Amino acid sequence: MSENVPDDLQYTRTHEWIRDLGNGQVEIGITDHAQQALGDLVFVEVPQVGRELKAGEACAVVESVKAASDVYSPVSGTVAARNDALGDKPELLNSDPYGQGWLMRVARRSAPADGPFLKATEYAQFVEEAG
């Protein structure tokens, strides 16, 4: 299984990625490893705009032909945008997990309490060691 782990993102041990948008918001999605493990995704449920999230809280659901899995918010804040395209095209999570397959954008409330996050090299090593 060949993993795609972009250097410009941060990662969690629960296989979410975080992209700092530079405007107080972060974009969040699931990693290439997560989408490969789940298989073909058939349903995605993302939180409503305006929902308050706490770091570590289950906030979205991704469902494949094999399993359903919770997605955990890596940060605390307010949902500022959600990727409504996933409602009609959940397969975007499989084909482009770091681009068109983003799940939500969150206006961060308290960056210091978030994390710890992994750098790309640390996440790649974590995935490799986990088998």
Regions inferred by a protein language model and the residue ranges of each:
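Acidic, low-complexity mobile loops and tails
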Residues: 1-55, 91, 95-131
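Short glycine/proline-centered loop/turn elements that form peptide/ligand docking sites
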Residues: 23, 58, 65
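Short, well-structured beta-strand-loop connectors
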Residues: 48-62, 78-81
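A general structural signal for short secondary-structure boundary/capping elements
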Residues: 61-62, 75, 123-128
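Mid-chain, well-packed structural core segment of small domains
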Residues: 62-100
